[in-house]
Regions:
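Conserved helicase ATPase core of P-loop NTP-dependent helicases/translocases
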Residues: 82-93, 257-261, 268-302
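Conserved interdomain linker/interface between the two RecA-like ATPase lobes of SF2 helicase motors
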Residues: 173-250
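Conserved RecA-like ASCE P-loop NTPase motor core of nucleic-acid helicases/translocases
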Residues: 53-61, 245-252, 273
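Conserved pre-motif I regulatory segment
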Residues: 1-28
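Conserved helix/coil segment N-terminal to the catalytic DExD/H
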Residues: 87-117, 128
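Post-DEXD/H (motif II) to motif III coupling segment of the RecA-like Helicase ATP-binding lobe
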Residues: 125-195
């Protein structure tokens, strides 16, 4: 069952196409609004309405591939889906719905074949340059099916150093923004934000960017040091000692485990979730975090 704004998103998307718009739309949805549920509902409706439809769901990390595929199965247990990801050691071809990593399929248009709809999660990572991986794959798929349509999804429809992702040269032509953070907070779907200044500062000098984002291996090397991790954990303890739950977004798998170890050493009940965490264990950890049994939860590209 979709929330009202999730169904509104799908309705506005269909209206966009019904209006005869040219180009490709980008859906802007706040973090925590449930993009994966919307994608699952959209794919299910498309396949059930037009059974011959072939959909390719792209993203940049295997954790999101796995997460999106799981949400699809939760929403539609018998979904005809496959996964194409070198990191997950899966190369499924031929299912109506394929979840794939862009690095694994950027040169595989001939193998993928005819696709009607491409969905791109975290689409702000799509380069405005024609030679980028996403652009190359879409160009190749368009040669196979000139009627191909692309839908992007992101919470941040802009790129540092370039501007909005609809600014030329751009893959996306319009932004559909069906719901605001303020509405989600008002309806209690999101908690109100209370930000605090920190005394600890981190230098990212020397950390390079790729596609407008920091290169994960370099960022993790910069932040995952004993001194930095200890300082951050101690500051969290001092600033958030009265809060029931602490959620940490870390720079990589190793970083997430190291922060969790420091929290445990400080006497804080903690756990860590990464892409390789088995589903049953992940569900147990999240349930414990929601109940308050686990106070601190670290993760890398999962939550």
């Amino acid at each position: 069952m979709l929330r009202d704004y999730q169904q509104r998103t799908i309705d506005q998307l269909y209206q966009w196409f019904a209006d005869g718009r040219k180009g490709h739309p980008c859906i802007e949805l706040p973090t925590g609004s449930g993009k994966s549920h919307i994608v699952a509902a959209l794919c299910k409706e498309a396949i059930q309405t037009w059974p011959e439809t072939r959909i390719l769901m792209l993203t940049h990390v295997k954790e999101l591939i796995e997460q999106n595929a799981e949400k699809m199965r939760d929403h539609w247990p018998n979904a005809p889906l496959g996964i194409y990801s070198a990191g997950m050691r899966r190369r499924d071809i031929g299912e109506p719905i394929t979840f794939a990593g862009i690095q694994s399929v950027r040169n595989k248009a001939d193998q993928i074949g005819h696709v009607d709809l491409v969905l791109i999660d975290e689409c702000h990572l799509v380069s405005h340059k024609q030679e980028g991986g996403y652009r190359k794959l879409i160009d190749d798929l368009t040669l196979i099916n000139p009627a191909l349509r692309v839908i992007g999804l992101t919470a941040t429809p802009y790129r540092l150093g370039h501007g909005y992702i609809t600014d030329e040269p751009a893959l996306f032509s319009d932004i559909i923004a069906p719901v605001s953070i303020e509405e989600l907070i008002f309806k209690k779907h999101l908690a109100p934000l209370r930000s605090k200044l920190t005394a600890h500062h981190l230098s990212v000098d020397g950390v390079h960017k790729r596609g407008g984002e920091y290169i994960e291996s370099e960022l993790q090397a910069a932040v995952d040091t004993d001194d930095h991790n200890v300082s951050v954990v101690d500051e969290v303890i001092s600033l958030a000692g009265d809060r029931r739950s602490w959620l940490f977004f870390c720079a990589g798998v190793r970083h997430a485990h190291n922060v969790a170890d420091i929290l445990t050493a400080r006497g804080i009940t903690s756990a860590c979730i990464v892409g390789d965490t088995p589903k049953a264990e992940r569900e147990r950890i999240i349930a414990g975090f929601k109940s308050g049994e686990i106070r601190a939860l670290t993760n890398a590209n999962v939550l």
